[in-house]
């Protein structure tokens, strides 16, 4: 911020010294002549311009903070949108699970649902609201059908319906809960509105404090720059400058440095211009060389990246040409030959096994029958056990989900309570700060009215007491004391009139003593004082009162400053606490998003596994049912037709031979499957290698992009510096051309400087809009001056904004500018 502020001031006051330098030069000026109104107006206008640009800069800082706040709000809305999208997907998954559960409970044939229409994903968060309503209407009949089916199931399975009294009791209970929730919601809405008001007030206070801090920072930076400038100019003496009323030798406050630059410009101007052109040519050639070297560096960097990627992830051709690959290929061929020999031995063993199987048919039949019986028994036991396990798992999952839900609710309640406590503490601290501010303002008011008694009352009782009631109590106490003393005097003296006169005499005596003491303190013990001494005493008495009032104001100002320091410190602590709260909330939001993403991924994986297991289970069930039906048919055929046993045995033998052929085919398919799996593994390895190479290339690309961005920023900074230097060079060239033209016309350096100063003063006197007429009128709001024609033209065209600062003005805000 200090660099930006420095740039603003340098652009505003390019030729004039700083305000501290002006004050120093004004204080060191030896001539008693006052500066002219024109110079004072110009300096005042420059100072006003600096203040205006500083105010614009502070407003820009405020806009930047507002922009950051709006960006944060946009990010929060985006996070809410993602949460809603996840909710949409959760609704889709829940709908799918409900349909599957109803289908399993009621049966797909009895339910008569079209799964293509029911399970079609109609809810999409990207679709507009009317289309979502249409999708919900399309699912409404299906939902009603599901609910009707559930009601039918409950009606068939229920023992007896609930009584009317129970229903009425439940209805009353639900209505009471609804009314309680409604009142609670209204209470929460009122609390939310109050919290919103306090939040807006806190935001306004924070905005005002930020503006005050920006102003203080800018003032601190300005004071630091002035201190540095005073240190740099502290050793310079100005005894030989001509004083013109402002302490400078020239009207705009410049010294004779420019004249020294142009003192020898006559004979050496051609050489300076030639050196400048040679330097420009040298800079252009260096720029071309730099661009060529940068292009070569880029090419070499790209070549290095390519070679690095090839070194980390070589190609297949290079791998095949390597000797290690040849050695591994030889080992692989040896292993393949060994596997083929083992396969031949396995085939021979299989043929022998088939022969033994054919010869041992009867034994196999008996064993198979016994195994079938045991299998059926074990299958029934396993089915019963699976149903028990599924029931227990369901109960366990329900209990776990309920426990997790309750834990999450308890954690949320604890967090909410802690946040409410933090807000209450911050509100209490804010109330204490406001109390301190009220006490400070009351003290300031008392100091402004020179009320010492009210200040002492504030120090003793604070802001909660009533000063008027305290004074009334003191008056009543004094009156009681006076009455007591009067009654005492009346008791002592029998004469009431004499006692009363004595009381009056004593009162007058005490007042005369106090007045005499005041006069003796001012005039001394001599009662014969002259008129001038009396006048002096009166003046001294006035000064004494002023001194007491100023001391009172100084004391109150110190107390107010200390209170302000404590308030600023407390507000800074509150701001730090709020900043930490915001950071913790951001981190919690990020952790929550990561957790939601991870849970969604795990849920998708679990769903895929579940559906795969269900499909496998259905396939196994279908196969088991088909096998059971075939076994029953075969048993019935065996019981009914024993006479065809021989033919059946022959058929069994034929079937066994076919089974052997199928087994051989299955072995061939297994070999093919192994080959395909090996190819798949090889392709996966290639894909992984390609992905690793791609990841490394992307990392290199990101690194190069970051380097390019850094180089671009550095280049932009250098370009800004070069633009600034070009402006300086252009200005120097213009001065060189002007000096050369002046030397050709035979004009002396002093005359040329006077001409330049005259042109500059004429430019200051002329209107900045048309640059033709002189400044005649001033806008009192911003104190910018223009000619009468330009302002009248703007008033006539209703463009009533200042051309310099854009501030709106009226016709009454224009005053005539008088030059004296």
UniProtKB/Swiss-Prot annotation:
<dbReference type="GO" id="GO:0061630">
    <property type="term" value="F:ubiquitin protein ligase activity"/>
</dbReference>
<dbReference type="GO" id="GO:0005634">
    <property type="term" value="C:nucleus"/>
</dbReference>
<feature type="region of interest" description="Disordered">
    <location>
        <begin position="1"/>
        <end position="38"/>
    </location>
</feature>
<feature type="coiled-coil region">
    <location>
        <begin position="68"/>
        <end position="92"/>
    </location>
</feature>
<dbReference type="InterPro" id="IPR017907">
    <property type="entry name" value="Znf_RING_CS"/>
</dbReference>
<keyword id="KW-0833">Ubl conjugation pathway</keyword>
<dbReference type="Pfam" id="PF08647">
    <property type="entry name" value="BRE1"/>
</dbReference>
<comment type="pathway">
    <text>Protein modification; protein ubiquitination.</text>
</comment>
<feature type="compositionally biased region" description="Polar residues">
    <location>
        <begin position="235"/>
        <end position="252"/>
    </location>
</feature>
<feature type="zinc finger region" description="RING-type">
    <location>
        <begin position="767"/>
        <end position="806"/>
    </location>
</feature>
<dbReference type="GO" id="GO:0008270">
    <property type="term" value="F:zinc ion binding"/>
</dbReference>
<keyword id="KW-0479">Metal-binding</keyword>
<dbReference type="InterPro" id="IPR013956">
    <property type="entry name" value="E3_ubiquit_lig_Bre1"/>
</dbReference>
<dbReference type="InterPro" id="IPR001841">
    <property type="entry name" value="Znf_RING"/>
</dbReference>
<dbReference type="GO" id="GO:0033503">
    <property type="term" value="C:HULC complex"/>
</dbReference>
<keyword id="KW-0808">Transferase</keyword>
<feature type="coiled-coil region">
    <location>
        <begin position="164"/>
        <end position="226"/>
    </location>
</feature>
<comment type="similarity">
    <text>Belongs to the BRE1 family.</text>
</comment>
<keyword id="KW-0156">Chromatin regulator</keyword>
<keyword id="KW-0175">Coiled coil</keyword>
<keyword id="KW-0862">Zinc</keyword>
<feature type="coiled-coil region">
    <location>
        <begin position="287"/>
        <end position="738"/>
    </location>
</feature>
<feature type="compositionally biased region" description="Basic and acidic residues">
    <location>
        <begin position="213"/>
        <end position="233"/>
    </location>
</feature>
<keyword id="KW-0863">Zinc-finger</keyword>
<dbReference type="InterPro" id="IPR013083">
    <property type="entry name" value="Znf_RING/FYVE/PHD"/>
</dbReference>
<dbReference type="Pfam" id="PF00097">
    <property type="entry name" value="zf-C3HC4"/>
</dbReference>
<protein>
    <recommendedName>
        <fullName>E3 ubiquitin-protein ligase BRE1</fullName>
        <ecNumber>2.3.2.27</ecNumber>
    </recommendedName>
</protein>
<feature type="compositionally biased region" description="Basic and acidic residues">
    <location>
        <begin position="1"/>
        <end position="12"/>
    </location>
</feature>
<dbReference type="GO" id="GO:0016567">
    <property type="term" value="P:protein ubiquitination"/>
</dbReference>
<feature type="region of interest" description="Disordered">
    <location>
        <begin position="213"/>
        <end position="254"/>
    </location>
</feature>
<dbReference type="InterPro" id="IPR018957">
    <property type="entry name" value="Znf_C3HC4_RING-type"/>
</dbReference>
<dbReference type="GO" id="GO:0006325">
    <property type="term" value="P:chromatin organization"/>
</dbReference>
<keyword id="KW-0539">Nucleus</keyword>
<comment type="function">
    <text>E3 ubiquitin-protein ligase that mediates monoubiquitination of histone H2B to form H2BK123ub1. H2BK123ub1 gives a specific tag for epigenetic transcriptional activation and is also a prerequisite for H3K4me and H3K79me formation.</text>
</comment>
């Amino acid at each position: 911020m200090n660099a930006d502020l420095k740039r603003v001031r340098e652009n505003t006051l390019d030729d004039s010294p700083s305000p501290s330098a002006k004050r120093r030069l004004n204080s060191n000026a030896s001539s008693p002549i006052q500066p002219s109104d024109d110079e004072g107006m110009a300096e005042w206008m420059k100072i006003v311009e600096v203040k205006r640009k500083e105010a614009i800069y502070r407003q820009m800082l405020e806009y930047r903070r507002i922009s950051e706040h709006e960006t944060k709000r946009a990010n929060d809305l985006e996070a809410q949108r993602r949460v809603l999208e996840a909710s949409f997907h959760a609704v889709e998954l829940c709908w799918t699970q409900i349909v599957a559960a109803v289908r399993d409970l009621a049966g797909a044939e009895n339910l008569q649902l079209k799964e293509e229409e029911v399970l079609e994903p109609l809810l999409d968060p990207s679709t507009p609201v009317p289309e979502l309503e249409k999708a919900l209407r399309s699912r409404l009949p299906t939902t009603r059908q599901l609910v009707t089916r559930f009601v039918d199931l409950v009606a068939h399975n229920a023992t007896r319906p609930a009584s009317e009294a129970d229903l009425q009791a439940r209805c009353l209970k639900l209505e009471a809960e609804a009314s309680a929730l409604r009142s609670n919601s209204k209470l929460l809405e009122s609390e939310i509105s109050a919290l919103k008001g306090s939040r807006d007030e806190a935001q306004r206070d924070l905005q005002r404090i930020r503006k005050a801090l920006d102003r203080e920072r800018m003032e601190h930076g300005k004071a630091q720059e002035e201190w540095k400038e005073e240190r740099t100019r502290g050793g310079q003496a100005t005894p030989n400058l001509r004083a013109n009323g402002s302490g400078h030798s020239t009207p705009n406050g410049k010294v004779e440095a420019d004249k020294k630059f142009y003192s020898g410009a006559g004979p050496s101007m051609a050489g300076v211009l030639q050196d400048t052109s040679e330097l420009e040519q040298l800079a252009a050639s260096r720029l071309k060389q730099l661009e060529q070297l940068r292009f070569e560096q880029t090419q070499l960097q790209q070549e290095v990246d390519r070679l690095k990627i090839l070194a980390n992830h070589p190609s297949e051709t290079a791998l095949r040409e390597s000797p290690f690959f040849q050695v591994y290929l030889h080992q692989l061929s040896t292993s393949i030959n060994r596997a083929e020999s083992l396969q031949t031995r396995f085939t021979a063993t299989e043929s022998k096994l088939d022969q033994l199987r054919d010869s041992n048919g009867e034994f196999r039949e008996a064993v198979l029958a016994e195994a079938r019986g045991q299998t059926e028994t074990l299958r029934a036991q396993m089915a019963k056990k699976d149903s028990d396990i599924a029931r227990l798992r369901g109960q366990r999952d329900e209990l776990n989900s309920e426990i997790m839900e309750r834990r999450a609710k308890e954690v949320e309640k604890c967090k909410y309570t802690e946040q409410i406590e933090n807000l209450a503490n911050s509100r209490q601290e804010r109330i204490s700060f406001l109390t301190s501010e009220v006490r400070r303002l009351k003290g300031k008011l008392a100091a402004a009215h020179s009320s010492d008694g009210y200040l002492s009352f504030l120090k003793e009782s604070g802001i909660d007491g009533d000063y008027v009631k305290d004074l009334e109590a003191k008056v009543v106490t004094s009156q009681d004391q006076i009455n007591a003393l009067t009654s005492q005097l009346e008791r002592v003296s029998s004469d009431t009139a004499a006692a009363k006169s004595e009381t009056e005499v004593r009162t007058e005596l005490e007042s005369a003593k106090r007045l005499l003491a005041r006069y003796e303190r001012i005039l001394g013990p001599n009662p014969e004082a002259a008129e001038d001494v009396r006048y002096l005493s009166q003046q001294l008495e006035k000064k004494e009162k002023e001194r007491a009032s100023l001391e009172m104001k100084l004391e109150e100002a110190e107390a107010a400053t200390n209170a302000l320091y404590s308030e600023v410190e407390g507000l800074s602590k509150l701001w730090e606490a709020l900043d930490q709260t915001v950071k913790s909330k951001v981190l919690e939001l990020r952790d929550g998003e990561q957790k939601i993403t991870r849970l969604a991924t795990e849920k998708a994986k679990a769903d895929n596994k579940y559906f795969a297991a269900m499909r496998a289970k259905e396939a196994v069930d279908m196969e088991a049912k088909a096998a059971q039906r075939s076994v029953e048919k075969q048993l019935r055929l065996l019981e009914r037709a024993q006479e065809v046993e021989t033919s059946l045995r022959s058929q069994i033998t034929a079937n066994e031979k076919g089974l052997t052929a199928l087994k051989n085919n299955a072995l061939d398919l297994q070999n093919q499957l192994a080959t395909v799996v090996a190819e798949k593994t090889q392709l996966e390895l290639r894909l992984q290698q390609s992905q690793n190479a791609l990841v490394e290339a992307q990392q290199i690309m990101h690194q190069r992009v970051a380097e390019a961005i850094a180089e671009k920023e550095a280049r932009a900074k250098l370009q800004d510096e070069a633009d600034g230097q070009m402006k300086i060079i252009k200005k120097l060239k213009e001065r060189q051309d002007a000096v050369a033209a002046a030397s050709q016309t035979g004009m002396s350096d002093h005359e040329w400087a006077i001409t330049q100063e005259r042109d500059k003063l004429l430019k200051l006197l002329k209107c900045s809009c048309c640059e033709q007429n002189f400044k005649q009128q001033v806008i009192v709001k911003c104190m910018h001056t223009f000619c009468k024609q330009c302002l009248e033209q703007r008033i006539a065209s209703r463009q009533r904004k200042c051309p310099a600062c854009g501030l709106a003005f009226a016709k009454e805000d224009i005053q005539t500018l008088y030059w004296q």
